[in-house]
Each structure stands twice: as structure tokens, then as C-alpha cells.
Amino acid sequence: MILDEIVEDKKKRLPGHMARIPETEMRRMAEETKTREADCFYNHLKKPGLSIIGEFKKASPSLGTITSKIDLMERISEYNASVDAISCLTEEDHFHGNVAYLKEIRAKSSLPILRKDFMICEYQFYEAKVIGADAVLLITAILDDAQMHDFYQLARELELDVLVETHDEAEVDRAMKINPRIIGVNNRNLKDFTISLEHTRRLRPYVPEDKVFVAESGITGDEDVRFLRDCGVDAFLIGRAFMESENPKALAQKWKELYQA
């Protein structure tokens, strides 16, 4: 399965990161890194109306290279004027991400930043804090219950918000055991990368109304926005549609107005 391959490649990558900066040093740096604004990711998504997380990614296993022509700073400037938070891929092998991209975004944006990666060890959480992330992603499909609990607690101790990602009823049930404030449904099946917004519709009743409910992936047009609005979604995480758009600011404004209609 593609997901297993991604996780295995992540395990191979981590020793190199740790060799450059040992975990004890990364932890010390994380503990000394001042929190920019506590709970900012959660607060930006919790506000009334539709919240949008604009994603920066250069590639994905399902699409290959999305575009090689986009300038990072130009796209972030557009996001600064249009979205409520930014998601940055830092996975190197399959999404062509890099922690350097997140650092650059942090230097140019005051918006909350989600580090989107396959988080499988404590080191990555310390690193996320140090490079300037405000939130991290926990993917239920790649973690057991003990890891979910421990990683969530670690993130909150570091004053990082957490987006807990699910894909089916069993994963939502597992996610709810840690009582997350933000829970997402990935409409893309990470095992075969097929997409269906029906996952969000089907899982909405399982998520309490007091949680911020995020729809991830597969949002490409007006009909998708209407469908997810009617499902009771609080926020969208949008990658490809914004990365391929010539005017993401106008697209975000259009979809926010459509959501309110």
C-alpha cells in the first residue's frame, strides 16, 4: 500500500535528521522556542463561517508534480490575503516537501501554520515547534492508540494545536478517545489514493458539534463547496485547487461567499 511505503521511507529519513541535530538538542530548542500565539490555529478555524486552510505542496503520490513554476513567496503572499491558515508539506520523498519551506513561510506570514507530515516519533514534534509550526497533523491510520494519546499530549505540552485526521468510522472512534478539538476527514483514501466526499458526509454524525470539523482533499469546484456546506463542515483544507489556481485569493473569496449563500 502507498501509505505503508510513505511511512517506511519516513523511518529511513529520520536518522539523518537526528544525526544533524540530536533529539536531546532538538528538545531543548523546542522548550526554549517561544509560542507565537497560543491556540492560534484552533482559533482561526473556530470563528463563524467557513475557514480555509490553504496548502503549499509541490507534488503528491496521486498527482505527481503539481507545478514547478510556482514561487513559494508569491503563493504565500496570495494566501496571506485569502485564507485563514496555511498547511505546509514537509515530507520529502513523496510530496517533495521540506522543513525549509515551512521556515520560509513562517518568515513571511503571520497566519497559523500546520506542519503536514507523517508524524511517527517525538523528534518530529520538537522539530515542528523549532521551525515555527503552530499545529501538527496526527494521522490515525498510522498510529496505535498509545501513540495517539502520547503524541497528542506532547503536542499540547509544546503548545501546538493538533489536527487529528480520520477516514472511517473506526478511526473516528479511536480519535475521539483523546478528545481532540480539531478533527478532520481525509476524503482521499491513503491506501489507494481514491477520493470521495461521501466520506465526510458519512462521518459527520460521529463528530460532536463542539469540535472543529475539517474536510480534507477532493475540494475542486463549486458543487463540492455546496455539498460540504450542507454536511456541516467548519473548515476546508485545500491543496491542488489553490496550487493550480492563477488567483487563489479570488477563488477563496468565491467559495466563502458560496458557503454563506
Regions found by a protein language model. Give the residues of each.
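Conserved N-terminal beta1-alpha1 strand-loop-helix module at the mouth
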Residues: 1-113, 120-122, 154, 159-179, ...
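Glycine-rich phosphate-binding active-site loops on the catalytic face of alpha/beta enzymes
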Residues: 127-147, 185-192, 233-251
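Catalytic-face loop-and-helix region of soluble metabolic enzyme cores
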Residues: 182-224, 229-238
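Hydrophobic, well-ordered secondary-structure scaffolds
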Residues: 114-143, 148-151, 155-158, 163-166
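Glycine-enriched alpha-helix->loop->beta-strand junction motifs that scaffold or abut catalytic
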Residues: 82-83, 108-111, 130-136, 156-160, ...
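Generic leucine side-chain signal with a strong bias for well-ordered alpha-helical environments
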Residues: 3, 102, 137-138, 143, ...
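Electropositive, surface-exposed helix/loop patches at the edges of structured domains
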Residues: 123-131, 153, 172-182, 200-207, ...
